[in-house]
Amino acid sequence: TMRDVLEIARAFATQDPDGNGKNDTYGLGVNKGLIAENNLPYAVLDGFFNSYHAYPSIWITDEDGKLAYGGIQPEMKDALADLQKLYAEGVIDPEFGVKDAVKVSENVNAGKVGMFYGYFWNCSSGWLQDGKMNDPSIDWIAVPILSIDDEPAKAMVPFATTYYTVVSMDCANPEAAVKMYNLVLEKMFGETAQPEVYNSTPENLAVFN
């Protein structure tokens, strides 16, 4: 259960996992953005909150079947209370408020973080692989989000579509928007792609607009 996760985090912080005689390992890695919406989704707390059935950055259906903002629901208080305890006990880096995802990853790769929440790509090169190269004995495992009670935890999943192109019904040639997209995709990724012209500068710097 989530209670086990909390105790494991405490164990990382208090039982000297690297054997250097110091309590210098943090049980739970946290970056200053706190949730994925505010920073790179590495060492963010979305999964932590979801274990308490709390959803800090999305709209949910409340008990009355109405739309309600997840960040102000009662479940948030329980999650925040346990986070406060972890922070007070030294399980969370006291300087997390000034460390972004990259900075936290440096601690992770140095073997100074026991666990963290993140996305699937967090195991890629640089985010976790550097630590494995430095210390082959490091062994990371992926664990499903666990619930604080008997109700299964549900993860916040970003909606697949993030941008829309809208054309006025009064537009004389609405199909031009589709043609423009087709041209961009063709010149960047199609059979006649010219990435050196459309996807990078003469200095070979990537261009994304």
Language-model region placement:
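Extracytoplasmic/secretory soluble proteins
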Residues: T1-N209
